[in-house]
């Protein structure tokens, strides 16, 4: 019966990885568009970085 957890878990993990990558690409595209529209936006974003 252990194989049921693998049968359900692997596709779920793969779907989560794909959705995570799609979200990252969406956020990256938004940031690039914002930066292209306003080049000074990068300076404002640098102040929000936590080291």
Curated annotation (Swiss-Prot):
The residues exposed to the Periplasmic compartment are: 27-51
Query: Which gene carries the instructions for this protein?
Result: cydX
- Which ranges form a coiled coil? none
Spell out the protein name for this chain: Cytochrome bd ubiquinol oxidase subunit X
Inducing stimuli = Expressed in stationary phase. Part of the cydB-cydX operon.
Highest taxon of the source?
A: Bacteria
Main location per the UniProt record: membrane
Q: Which biological process terms from the Gene Ontology are attached to this UniProt entry?
A: oxidative phosphorylation
What reaction does this enzyme carry out catalytically?
A: 2 a ubiquinol + O2(in) + 4 H(+)(in) = 2 a ubiquinone + 2 H2O(in) + 4 H(+)(out)
* UniProt keyword Nucleus present: no
> Topology in the membrane?
Single-pass membrane protein
The entry's keywords: Cell inner membrane, Cell membrane, Electron transport, Membrane, Translocase, Transmembrane, Transmembrane helix, Transport, Virulence
Q: Which family does it belong to?
A: Belongs to the cytochrome ubiquinol oxidase subunit X family.
Pfam families listed in its UniProt record: YbgT_YccB
TM ranges are 4-26
Q: Which parts of the chain does the record assign to the membrane side Cytoplasmic?
A: 1-3
Quaternary state and partners of this protein?
A: May be a subunit of cytochrome ubiquinol oxidase.
Places the protein is found:
Cell inner membrane
Q: What class of enzyme is it?
A: translocase
The cellular component terms of Gene Ontology attached to this UniProt record, alphabetical and capped at eight, are: plasma membrane
The annotated pathway is: Energy metabolism; oxidative phosphorylation
The knockout outcome noted for this protein's gene is: Highly attenuated in macrophage-like line J774 and female BALB/c ByJ mouse infections. Loss of viability in stationary phase growth in culture. Increased sensitivity to H(2)O(2), acid pH, highly sensitive to the combination of NaN(3) plus NiSO(4).
The answer on whether this UniProt entry bears the keyword Cell membrane reads yes
State which Enzyme Commission number(s) the record gives: 7.1.1.7
**Biological function:** Required for correct functioning of cytochrome bd oxidase.
């Amino acid at each position: 019966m252990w194989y049921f957890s693998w049968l359900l878990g692997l596709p779920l993990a793969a779907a989560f990885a794909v959705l995570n990558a799609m979200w990252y690409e969406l956020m990256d595209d938004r940031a690039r568009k914002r930066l292209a529209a306003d080049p000074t936006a990068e300076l404002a974003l640098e102040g929000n970085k936590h080291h």
